[in-house]
Curated annotation (Swiss-Prot):
Biological function: This protein specifically catalyzes the removal of signal peptides from prolipoproteins.
Source organism, top-level taxon: Bacteria
Subcellular location, record wording: Cell inner membrane
Membrane topology: Multi-pass membrane protein
Protein name stated in the entry: Lipoprotein signal peptidase
Gene: lspA
């Protein structure tokens, strides 16, 4: 591995590790709850906005879709990870820094969630946001990394000419 891409690789491992550790902490803390305590580990309420840390599991894709296709989903996820990693590796020098950051975030999130599937058979979600009666589906840090990376990538490709190099 060239030394130029080493910081990207280490960042990828660090972010995936932060995701895994956060999930492990939530799972361990949730095991310590007594049966008579509330189900959430942390809550913050500000007006009509609330933030909860409450463990839940997702056996499908985003928002619990495709739960009946566990093996094909896992194969698809692994193929996406390998494809993105290969693209990042081959095109590293020619990619803009923002594109590398975006792809690193997406890969770290994907690795975090695939690690869950391999360890637990499902993805561990624990972050919950709501406003009034509207509740956003539970998510985790890996999901946040993927979302932020995707938004960065779309924004960068939309507002620059770099997209013409690849598409």
């Amino acid at each position: 591995m060239p030394t130029r891409s080493l910081p990207t690789f280490l960042t990828l491992l660090l972010l995936a590790s932060i995701d895994w550790v956060s999930k492990l902490v939530v799972l361990l803390k949730s095991c310590q709850l007594s049966p008579h305590s509330s189900a959430f580990l942390y809550s913050y309420v500000w007006g009509h906005f609330s933030f909860l840390i409450i463990p839940s599991f997702n056996e499908g894709a985003a928002f619990g879709l495709f739960t009946q296709y566990k093996i094909p989903l896992l194969i698809f996820r692994v193929c996406v990870i390998l494809g993105l990693a290969l693209f990042l590796r081959i095109k590293y020098k020619s990619l803009h820094r923002r594109t590398r950051v975006a792809l690193t975030l997406i890969l770290a999130g994907a690795l975090g969630n695939v690690g869950d599937i391999l360890l637990y058979g499902k993805v561990v979600d624990f972050l919950s946001l709501s406003y009034y009666s509207w509740r956003f589906p539970s998510f985790n840090l890996a999901d946040a990394f993927i979302s932020i990376g995707t938004l960065l990538l779309i924004g960068h490709l939309y507002f620059t000419k770099e997209s013409k190099k690849y598409f």
